[in-house]
Structures are given as structure tokens and as C-alpha cells.
Amino acid sequence: MARIAGINIPDHKHTVIALTSIFGIGKTRSQAICAATGIAEDVKISELSEEQIDKLRDEVAKFVVEGDLRREVTLSIKRLMDLGTYRGLRHRRGLPVRGQRTKTNARTRKGPRKPIKK
């Protein structure tokens, strides 16, 4: 297994699909990485030479991925909560942030129903 950005990339998958196993790299970005390195998208990771894998590592290193990206997202949400913005309050209360209705639905964010005690 090739190791890129601290993640074991699956050998049996095509390069474009395998790169998406890294947090922060989706299909479009993985296609751009393949184009920049000159590696065909339909080549499997196991068929790549060590030199090609090094090229992929260098290209992926240009982006914010994995732990750094997770930390960045967490800090931006924490910043919203500290500022006391509306979005921060919604995050703190565990409610939908982007204006969805909450009278019905929103069960994923709100959690299981709490029965009314008589």
C-alpha cells in the first residue's frame, strides 16, 4: 500500500478513486492532481512506480488535507461560537445551521425524539 499524506492508499483502485480516500481531496481535485503529475487516471496504484508515487505525494502536499484541514474546520466553527454569531449559536445548540426548518424534520441534528413527560 502506498502512503500519501499519512493515509494508506488502497492499491487495487484506480488513481483518481484512490486519492479520494484522503480527507480534503474529492474527485475534481484528484483529477487535477493526476493531470498535474501526468499520471493516467485509470492506472491502479499498484501499477505506479515509486517515482510516480513521490510525484503524487509532492502534489498532494500543496493542498491542506487530513489533520490540518480537520483542525481548520473545527477552529472556524469554534471561532463562530466564540464570536456569538447566529451560526455559532446554532452549532452550540446542535440545530441546523443553514436555515432549514426545525418544526418538523431536522432529526439528524436534534437527535432522537424526547418524550413529553406528563
Curated annotation (Swiss-Prot):
Residues 92-118 are annotated as: Disordered. The keyword Transmembrane helix does not apply. GO terms for biological process: translation. It comes from the Bacteria. Located at the top of the head of the 30S subunit, it contacts several helices of the 16S rRNA. In the 70S ribosome it contacts the 23S rRNA (bridge B1a) and protein L5 of the 50S subunit (bridge B1b), connecting the 2 subunits; these bridges are implicated in subunit movement. Contacts the tRNAs in the A and P-sites. Part of the 30S ribosomal subunit. Forms a loose heterodimer with protein S19. Forms two bridges to the 50S subunit in the 70S ribosome. PANTHER family: 30S RIBOSOMAL PROTEIN S13/40S RIBOSOMAL PROTEIN S18, SMALL RIBOSOMAL SUBUNIT PROTEIN US13M. This is Small ribosomal subunit protein uS13. It comes from Pectobacterium carotovorum subsp. carotovorum (strain PC1). The lineage of its organism: Bacteria, Pseudomonadati, Pseudomonadota, Gammaproteobacteria, Enterobacterales.
